Every structure is written in C-alpha cells, then in structure tokens.
Amino acid sequence: MRKIFYDFEVFKHLWLVVFIDYDTGKGKCIVNNEDQLRDFYNKTKNDIYIGYNSRGYDQYIFKGILLGMDPYYISSQIIEKNKKGYEVVKKGWKIPFNNFDISTGFHSLKQLEGFMGSRIKESSVPFDLDRELTESEIKETVSYCLHDVKETIKVFDGKREEFDSQLALIEAFKLDMNKFTKTKAQLSAFTLGAEKQPNRNDEFDLRFPDTLVVSEKYQHIVDWYKDPENLDYKKKLKVDVAGVPHIFAWGGIHGALPKIKDEGIILCADVASLYPSLMIEYGYNSRNIKDPKRYTEIRDKRLKLKAEKNPMQLPLKIVLNC
C-alpha cells in the first residue's frame, strides 16, 4: 500500500493537483483534466492519500471532480461560506477514499514551514482571478503546489508516529481502510460502539466520588467547583498545592514549577491508564457507549500487552484516551 501525498489548487477557470509517491519520490501533475484524474484514482484508490488539511478540503475537491462537480464551487463553499465538505459534496461517500490528514489543527502549513526552517514560498497568482490563467501563471502555480506537497512530506516525517498509530488502530480492530480519513476520536467511538445522542444539557450536574478525601487546607478547591458562579468554561482557579503553582479548570488540572534545577535521585511516578481506570471505577465513561464493559476489556487487554512490552498496546491506548 503506497503513501501518496497530494495538494489541490483551485481557480475559477482552472484546477490542478500534484501527487508525490512517498517511497519512490516520483511525482505527477494534472491540470484541468478530469479523465487523467479519474485514471490516476482508479490506479491508486487502494493506496493512502496524505495531505495537509485534506480531510476538510482536498479530498472533497478530488471526490467532487470525479462526481462531475465544479471544483471552484466546492472550494468557495468550503472557504468562503465555511461549509463542511460533506455538506457540499453530498455524494462524496460513494467514492472510496483512504485519506490521512497530517495537519496539526493549530498551525497552517506555512507556519510549520517556518518552524522547520524551510523557505516559505508564496504564489503571486491571486486565487480569485476571473479569467483564464496564462502559461506563466500556471507554471508558477504548479511550482507553488509542488513546494507545498514537498513541505507536507517534511511535516509527515516529523510526525510519522501519528500515521503509524492510525494504521495500527485500524489494523488492531480490523476496520476498513476507508476509515483512515477519520480522526482518532471518531475511530475510537466506532471501536467502542458509541452513538451520537441529543445534547443532554447536563454537563454541570456534577457528581463527586464518595471516596474523595480532601484536607481542610484544600477544601476551597472542591468548593470552587461547587460554586454556581464558576460553572463557566472560561473560569479557572490558580492556587499553590504543595508549593507548586496549579491551575484548576474545566478541562483538567495542570501543575508544574516554572523552572527547577536539582541534583540527586529524581523520581518520576506514573500510573498506567490512570484516567481510564478512574472512568471505569467511578462510572465516568461516556454514556454514548452502548456497552461500558467493552471499554474495561480494552483497558485490561492494554495493561496486559504493556506488561509484555507488546507494541500492540499503543492502538488500545489511543482508544482509551480519546
């Protein structure tokens, strides 16, 4: 199964795509030719396409062209109207497509190029041109697109474990390869048999564990969570615990010394599957999971594999932590 990196550039009167085979380094450029794109797809549809922001954009341009849609319409709906790709290319599900998105979700490709010390290449050809592109403009756009694909490969090389863990997750649970385009959270939900439910509007109906023991010194932290005034995701509590600055909020707890220099025996204490175990012990698992025992079984199997130093524990860890 080959890894094919790709990127689309779309104008009103022209579209183009650049593909690069990861293992051979061979590239292919297709400009405004639906037949060539269809032929390439038929030869590579069992391989994995990898792009930057391809989950939300490029794969739908690809699918839309194969379905006879106008790529510029698709692009403008996604970018300008802020629509989801599946809302625009409604029959996209009919096109089998093994897509993997290497984007971070926090940075643009250009930002990462800068972080990696690469030359940031910009195109002087505006994407809102309302005319045919000249030969020189097409040549520049191809060069720009090729550069972006090569930079995407660099990002991939730096985040290879993301791809490997995704593949391991699919193989461990014998999922179809067309699930590759899903996020790890989506794959985990599928693996656990979770189903989307209507909004219950009860996320602040807090239930504290009956085993919770807090000294008087830190009782104010528990009281902070009980205070109706603090039932706001923007609120947070900053307080020292055991001499260490902590931040308590609704996404969790973070505590660390700003900086420290020490010598001697330094211990690093860790608990295997701490949060999954707490979820199991106190019934804090997602109510969308039909059979909570499934989660417990995966936790137990993961701990067994980890003790055996079996690498197959990694995809199970992903499911537990998502």
Model region roles, listed by residue range:
Residues D23-G56, I61-C322:
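Conserved acidic
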